[in-house]
Amino acid sequence: MKKAKKIQYDSIYNLGQLKASGYKSKSVKEEVRNNLIKTIQEKENPFVGIMGYEDTVIPDTERAILSQHNILFLGLRGQAKTRMARQMIDLLDEYIPVIAGSEVNDDPFKPLSRYAYDLIAEKGDDTPIEWVHRTTRYGEKLATPDVSVADLIGDIDPIKAANLKLSFSDEKVIHYGIIPRSNRGIFVINELPDLQARIQVALFNILQEGDIQIRGFKLRMPLDILFVFTANPEDYTNRGSIVTPLKDRIESQILTHYPKNIETSLAITEQEANILPAQKERVNISDLVKRIIEQVAFEARSNEYVDRKSGVSARLTIAALENAVSSAERRAIIHNEANTQVWISDLNGIIPAITGKIELVYEGEQEGPYQVAVNLIDKSVR
């Protein structure tokens, strides 16, 4: 197999040099697919630091990427949905060329915007290009009820029209939204159900045809984007749901889950907990206490007073471990002890980490969040 010629990014500044280099443009989904294939062949893990998904979510995600699908991660809170999306950045090529000054990352060989067409028509092979790093090709938007079509797709900019003395019928007066600006990259919408239904409808054409429409302009922009969405399976927030035709257009829906055993949960907590070096020197924590803390989350997920539709985030055990260490550290400071252990009595200090991270059903509200937290610790110790 013939080895691909390595492109010298620092020596290519214009379209003519890019053509001479033999560079071939490819779609972002093709790019991610090719890099995933290399990663799998080299026996590397494309999702480093994601634990407990080795036989479930990661293979599903790899299959979706190989199929060049847009992806919806569906799962309860604290299941690493956004982290999975963010780690896809590493599957992009390190650098890609774009028309210099383009707002929508125009491919020099397949320009989209009027700006790029005009620049190429004017300068030809002398059209300046710049190399964009993969970290800048990732866009993310948290869906909130106030997000508008203009935010996502774009709108006419009357100030730009006035300053440039242009008619509203001129393409140059368009102010592009975050989706066109993420062209040739990965775009993530977190908590998709929180997006108003009419805004979700605006995404239909982008997902089906890959193009956008702005304020009645007869303009077709076939965007090149890998879309990743995250959502909760149950509408426990009462803010909305994913409209069926939109769900139908997202090719792969991947179900995430909580750790299936304490060992995996323990590894995640130890990886994510922010225990300071000074705390590690002063406070020792036994494996038994760590396991009791993990058991609190497992007990909560099956507890009759806790709303299972809401879920119990992995953030509970992370915050609880930090609080347990801080509780022992505080005791050591008060008694002028150089070193100490986390005792079972220190677990009272993890109650604030529990009460804010569990949603209670009606009976649980009657019992009270403090008492429910105490009962969960009590069951875990037993």
Question: Residues of each region from the PLM?
Answer:
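Conserved ASCE/P-loop NTPase catalytic core
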Residues: 2-263, 274-291, 299, 304-308
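Amphipathic alpha-helical interaction segments
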Residues: 56, 60, 83, 288-292, ...
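AAA+ ATPase "lid" subdomain C-terminal helix
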Residues: 67-71, 298-306, 318-339, 353, ...
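An accessory alpha-helical subdomain
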Residues: 308-316
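C-terminal engagement/docking regions of AAA+ P-loop ATPases
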Residues: 309, 329-382
